[in-house]
Every structure is written in structure tokens, then in C-alpha cells.
Regions:
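Secretory/exported precursors with cleavable N-terminal leaders
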Residues: 1-176
Length: 176
């Protein structure tokens, strides 16, 4: 387990978590650990129902001692059906209009695939084009108000854009 001292704490009825800001200031790692009494419903909620932006916006200042497992996850997903289910349909039609991008015709999208890889280790985080180093705060903490978050069971994570609070990469670690 990696140990990290953070200052952004997240807690509600379902999750306890933290935000770890990456060097450079553009992105942050957010981890949400389901509370033990909520763990049975965790899989129902996991990614689809987790509003990462709302959690990012709800963070509050606290001294947080975070324990993070080293992990690496790679996934391959076929997203054609998902794209169509959210209304992106015309690009799959043989009559799709791509005239604003090319003069070559006829063009259509046959499938949408995604390969995602995230690796969190002592050197930092690598996810697609996102990388970071761990930074430790350097002031004396108020020991009575320290929050402890140990990611020792399945949890949700996201790499979020700090300006918008929106995830650029998200997933679930279900095996430690």
C-alpha cells in the first residue's frame, strides 16, 4: 500500500474518499470507498450512478491520511451499442455526413472501440496521457481531526479535470 497525505476529503451516506491533486494542477485522482454497511449495494451504484462531478465539488478541507493499493487495470470495450443508446446514431449510417471533415465519400463509422489502461504505483499514475507524482503536504496536522481512508476493499476511482470536475478516466478496483 502507498501512503499519501491529502487535504481534500469527501464523505456522504454512501462513500468516504479523497482527492489527490497531481503535479501540474490540471488533473486529480479521486477515490471513493463505499462505507461498509453500503458495500452490498456497491456494484449496483458503482460507475453508472456515481456523479463524479458532484463528489468532486463536495470535497472539504481536512487532513487525510490515504492508503492506496498499487494497481494496474487494462480494459477493451466495444462502445458502438452504448453510443447508439445515448443518441449517437447517424454516424453509423451509410448516408452519414462527414463533409466537414473530409471530401472522401461515402464514409460511416462501423464500430467504436476503447482500450483503457491505468497504472497507479510509487512513481505516480499513468492513464492514457495522464501522469503524476505524489506530493506530501508539509505542515503539522491537527491529530484530532485527521481522516483516514484506506482503500482495502473494492472502490471507485476517477482521474478528474480540476477545472470542470468532470472525469476523464474512471473505473472500479474490485480485486486487491
Amino acid at each position: 500500500m502507498l501512503r499519501s497525505d491529502e487535504e481534500d476529503y469527501i464523505e456522504d451516506d454512501f462513500y468516504t474518499g479523497f482527492v489527490k491533486n497531481y503535479r501540474g494542477g490540471k488533473y486529480a485522482f479521486m477515490a471513493l470507498l463505499p462505507k461498509k454497511k453500503k458495500a452490498k449495494t456497491f456494484w449496483k451504484r458503482a460507475i453508472e450512478q456515481t456523479d463524479f462531478k458532484a463528489y468532486y465539488d463536495s470535497r472539504s478541507y481536512a487532513e487525510v491520511v490515504a492508503r492506496i493499493p498499487e494497481f494496474e487495470i487494462a480494459t477493451d470495450m466495444e462502445l458502438t451499442g452504448f453510443c447508439q443508446s445515448i443518441g449517437i446514431k447517424s454516424i453509423f449510417n451509410p448516408d452519414a455526413d462527414f463533409s466537414g471533415m473530409t471530401t472522401q465519400e461515402p464514409l460511416m463509422v462501423s464500430s467504436v472501440l476503447q482500450k483503457a489502461v491505468i497504472k497507479v504505483d510509487r512513481a505516480g499514475t499513468k492513464a492514457a496521457a495522464v501522469s503524476a507524482m505524489y506530493v506530501v503536504a508539509g505542515c503539522a496536522p491537527d491529530f484530532d481531526n485527521i481522516k483516514y481512508v484506506e482503500l482495502d476493499r473494492p472502490f471507485v476511482y476517477a482521474v478528474v479535470d480540476r477545472e470542470s470536475g468532470l472525469p476523464v478516466f474512471s473505473g472500479v478496483v474490485n480485486k486487491l
